[in-house]
């Protein structure tokens, strides 16, 4: 009976290892987005919070690799917090996207002219790259949050 319970543990361990890999990828992506967005306060703050959360959740992910069945509440808590971070990072990406569109095209009703016509095209592409990095980190966080498998654990009689 104990060998059957241990077989499920190896599957959970692979899920936890994949989750750790996704956390590291999200840390890299949010760090790049924070570095690229130094002028945009909201985007920097949101990605900084997400990066800090990901760094703080690494020990819990490593613990879940070593002991997959020890505390199932850890996985639930991480899943909920991952979804909160997805919402924050997505909000930052949307805010940066709106600023990008207004700066690029202007707004005729508000009598705003295009800002990008006064600068070279490289700064325009830098902001576009920032938005893509933020969206990429949001997608990685979303995939990480959906990675958790909820399955019924076999009870040992």
Swiss-Prot record:
Topology feature Extracellular, residues: 35-40, 104-121
Family in the record: Belongs to the Casparian strip membrane proteins (CASP) family.
Residue spans, topological domain Cytoplasmic: 1-13, 62-82, 143-157
The protein's name in its UniProt record: CASP-like protein 1
Description of how the protein assembles with itself and partners: Homodimer and heterodimers.
Membrane topology field: Multi-pass membrane protein
Alphabetically ordered keywords of this record: Cell membrane, Membrane, Transmembrane, Transmembrane helix
Transmembrane segments: 14-34, 41-61, 83-103, 122-142
Pfam annotation, one family: CASP_dom
Superkingdom of origin organism: Eukaryota
InterPro entries associated with the record: CASP/CASPL, CASP_dom
GO CC annotations, alphabetized: plasma membrane
Subcellular locations according to the entry: Cell membrane
């Amino acid at each position: 009976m104990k060998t059957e319970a241990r077989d499920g543990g190896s599957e959970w361990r692979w899920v936890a290892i994949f989750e750790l890999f996704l956390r590291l990828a999200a840390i890299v992506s949010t760090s790049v987005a924070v570095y690229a967005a130094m002028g945009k306060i909201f985007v920097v703050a949101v990605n900084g919070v997400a990066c800090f959360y990901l760094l703080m959740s690494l020990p819990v992910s490593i613990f879940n690799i070593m002991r997959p069945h020890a505390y199932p509440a850890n996985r639930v808590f991480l899943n909920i917090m991952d979804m909160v971070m997805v919402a924050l990072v997505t909000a930052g990406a949307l805010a940066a996207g709106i600023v990008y569109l207004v700066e690029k095209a202007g707004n005729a009703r508000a009598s705003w002219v295009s800002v990008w016509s006064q600068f070279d095209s490289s700064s325009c592409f830098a902001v576009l790259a920032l938005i893509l990095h933020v969206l990429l980190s949001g997608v990685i966080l979303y995939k990480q949050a959906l990675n958790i498998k909820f399955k019924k654990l076999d009870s040992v009689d």
